[in-house]
């Protein structure tokens, strides 16, 4: 066991994490040169295109060090984005060490820090590495100062490398072997294995990626999950060298996979502990928690007959994404669809994109909302994740909205504009620190404000230099109201929004004005109204298209003209009673694009 090293790589988006992983695999000969491709461990197309890692992947590599010994290195690739922070903490708790990759030309950024603190809390040894030192803009001294200043770990002897050219990659492995301790654990103790990740394979069912903490596991033994108590016979165990390879057994300290003919992904929850049925461990490994969705949106098929296809696609996605939740929902305006829960905005975009790309779905998405805690006047508390389910104003005693703590990092030139943005979003400042040229701001902001367009606007006010990460803090009482949109007096449920009272009139007016531009003119007048309860806060009219019925009258008596106009008026009135207004797809997106003033 002294020759095993389990490590993962922590980095901000675009700091070269996946490229470094590729180089390490190449140096260790995990894949032949002809099988090498960029970003070996990012298996989904969408991961490659966006240049992000979503699912955790592993590679078991062997490396002959300069002291002549052969070491087994287990690389566990972690997602870097804030939405997947639970997956990151699971991946990290399976390691003894982490390479902290910092771009020498850009310095430390928000997600690096967030994941790095997670690593330090879990007691993982952090080894700093400066990447991209072949760039003309690289400034390693500055980067080292920032690492020491912001994160507070000694980085004077940080290894310098360039993952792109392969320069210094062996030095990285050497310092990894020197600084990271070998795994502890007893191969003879009762089995405890931590599930780092799980995914669905069409041929063998669920594949679980595990780190064996104690004990030994062989095929044909019976295992059980400690969170659910379900039992399964093991079919195969093995490791990935990115390609899978079956082994006779997995023992303490190793990272590998278990295939046990499990049909549902929900049975193999990330962070759960696997143990033997016969000789069970007395307690599970710490740190398991159920992941709760934070952001909800309605997904509807454009064609009503695609509903079943959408349900099947969601079921298939759920196989590979246990944190996705969905339930059927009916909307008068959009027909049948699903209310889906996501971990965050990026997660939502990815699910939508995968549905459109892998399953060829055409979707309408309603505005994303967060979960509100509503105390009703009879004292009961309900969770509301859909504006349509919000009770009438008279039945509500108090509404609490989720507040998140946001950490922002940016160069000091942009502090002013970022603070202005946070104030607009009803944020309250908690802390502000200067680290050299970088500034760290901490704000508490309602989650609902972040869901809409906070990230995009942060990038635009800081010219792309600011980075952020957020975590849920608490529910806090707030004065929020539901704004309904009425078209000719009928509520359109899919257009309801929940906003803070201070912005409700403005948002109602804006949405009404937007809809006036978007809804095509009808043969009769259409009134668009925004209402809070029974109180109308805004109104826009779409004038009717009309035919000039007087064109054929030439001269003649006024009563003749009056008669024709009256007849037209009657016809329009009749039409208005039977007609219904078609609402185009853009109207639903219009809500998203309303900016706060």
Swiss-Prot record:
Alphabetical list of CDD domains matching this protein: EF4_II (cd03699), EF4_III (cd16260), LepA (cd01890), lepA_C (cd03709)
Root EC class: hydrolase
Gene3D superfamilies noted in UniProt: 3.30.70.240, Elongation factor 4, C-terminal domain (3.30.70.2570), Elongation Factor G (Translational Gtpase), domain 3 (3.30.70.870), P-loop containing nucleotide triphosphate hydrolases (3.40.50.300), Translation factors (2.40.30.10)
Reactions performed catalytically: GTP + H2O = GDP + phosphate + H(+)
Limits of the tr-type G domain: 2-184
Domain of life of the native organism: Bacteria
GO biological process, one term: positive regulation of translation
The EC number(s) this enzyme carries: 3.6.5.n1
InterPro entries: EF-4, EFG_III/V, EFG_V-like, EFTu-like_2, G_TR_CS, LepA_C_sf, LepA_CTD, LepA_IV
Classification via SMART domains: EFG_C
Keyword list, A-Z: Cell inner membrane, Cell membrane, GTP-binding, Hydrolase, Membrane, Nucleotide-binding, Protein biosynthesis
Gene Ontology CC terms: plasma membrane
This protein's name: Elongation factor 4
